[in-house]
Amino acid sequence: MDRGLIVNRVYDIYGLYTDLKKEELNKTIKIVKDTKNIACSYARFEYYLILYMDAIINQKEVDTALYKRIIELGKNIFSVRELSIYYDIMALEKMYLNETKEALGYLDKALCYNGNHLMINYHYCSIYLDLGYFNLAQQYIHKSLRMAVQQLSFDRLYYLLLNQGVLYMYTSRYDEANKLFLKLLNESIKRQNEIMKYCILSNLVFTSLIQKDIKSGFDYLNRIDEQFTDDLDLKMYKCHLYYFDNEYTKAKECIASFLRNVKDSKYHENFIRALKYMMDNKPMKAIANFETCYQIALKNGQYDRAIFVLKQLNELYLDFGLQNKLKKVKELQENFYKMSHANQIIEDIGLKLN
């Protein structure tokens, strides 16, 4: 068994993952898996690294603990490039588990092992974007965009541009976000990339809702493929669009259907109940539910949801003369802006509405 050949397979698989070439990636993994006696060869540690990469990249429901234990036994023979790949995949596993601090720790390790790879920078920008560290996210987006162009990794480039659009959206630069999203939407249609199309249309529904552009919101919502219509955010946006459009009968039907089917998301359940209370002219109950939504979003580090809820609370506090609460919302929105320039974790801020 030529260990060097399997080491090159590790590099090939990581490169195919970077370029989003899933079919070729899985063919390469299958070739390795079908190699006779590889688990007992000098390349056995690379073999288990490839099994680990397969499990995480393809999000398979397997226990990866055994793979990692074996890899740890043999990682001292890995090249620095293999080590950087290993730690980046460990970071990706933690990202899927929403264990952000641990993911950042593994990315730092990957970077230490000569790991200035596109995907490591891409993972940094994704995490910082989720946490609301917008200056840091922007730095890594710019760096990753340059690397993607240099490496001709155009499929990955589109996802980086999507991140740029999301950053515009999070920082209330909606015109810039919409302009970029529409360009990416056209590209996704040309490429017949349904997942990219769904991501972009979802964001366009969100920006339309924020801007109360009801017609555009429904237009984008109706263009999303049926396979994605179970998305709870999209269902929630639909109810909200009916409410903004004064289609109260449809809004009530939408809310009733949502509450019958929502199970595991307290955020969505509280948001829809708040909307129902607004329609039932029970503003104080609506406010209480929105405040619960805010705390849930904050706890989960979901910046976009937290800001969206604050916008609803801002209008309600203003309408019902709750000046102390209104002042607090302004402070929270300012703190979110300041937070984007600071090195702190969103869960540690401890912002309270009461």
Features from the language model and the residues they span:
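Flexible inter-repeat linkers and adjacent short helices
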Residues: 1-90, 102, 107, 255, ...
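Loop-centered beta-sheet repeat module
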Residues: 134, 138-203
